[in-house]
Amino acid sequence: MDVPGISRPVLVVLIVVAAVIFLYGAGTALSRVTEHTETQTRTFAAASTVVIATNSADVKIVASDRSDVRVTTKEQRSLWGGGHVRMRGNAGGLELRDRCHGLPVVEDPCHVRMLLEVPRSTSVRVDTATGDVRAENLEGGADLSSGTGDTHVIGVRGPVRVQAQTGDVDVEAPAPDISVQTATGDVAIVASHAQTIHAAAATGDIVLVVPNLTYAVDAQSDAGDDKVLVHVDDASPRKLRAHTNTGDVIVSSDAP
């Protein structure tokens, strides 16, 4: 077939491009129509410290009245593929291998979520490459590491340790000992029983909110404002340290 003014090689290229666009659109539409979530549940014997390693799953750990550990995974899939999960190990060292299967020319849903219900006294250690992490109401400690993703710690009573390469970190907990470090992301800590808080960010704002008491405070921003709005006494046993290279630092009390 010849089209006046368009050479045959150019026409072939245009036809191929049009076909690819059509296939992409049709495939993506079919993917959306057939999108669904598959759920798996497994139980493990309890461990004093539950250790989780994942590739790209969102991980949520909640304290419960269970005597064992229940793990629920939700895999988002479609006709063309999607998220797949394989668990290996036990509660003391559980490895979650999550990956995506699908067609490279189709926008396919691929997402994995993981929920762990653990005894209240449990401590947790989580290491994820990409994904959000959330820990709630543990009486033990939380040691959370994320390459890319936001981290949320709510109601944890034991020591809190968070390391994130890229992502915001929010902590609202009675934990007396809290340490947060992020390369890129904001840090917000509301500590109702603060004894020692260390917060550091290469790029991002840091906000600390603590009870209306006296603290030894080390707050510094290399390129931003730093405001200390609490009672300061360098001899206080309660230590607050907040450093950021680029961003603001605010240390305030929860007093009205």
Model-found features: residue ranges?
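Terminal targeting segments of Actinobacterial cell-envelope proteins
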Residues: 1-9
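Short linear S-[DN]-x-LW-Φ motif typified by the pepsin-like aspartic protease active-site region
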Residues: 11, 30-93, 113-117, 123, ...
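Short, surface-exposed interaction patches in beta-rich subdomains
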Residues: 160, 168-256
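Membrane-spanning beta-strands of outer-membrane beta-barrel proteins
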Residues: 44-45, 109, 235
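Short, T/G/N/S-enriched strand-turn elements that build extracellular solenoid repeat scaffolds
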Residues: 40-41, 58-63, 84-86, 113-117, ...
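Hydrophobic membrane-insertion alpha-helices, especially the h-region
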Residues: 8-28
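Non-cytosolic head/periplasmic domains of membrane-anchored proteins
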Residues: 97-183
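Beta-strand elements of well-folded, non-transmembrane domains
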Residues: 56, 75-77, 130, 148, ...
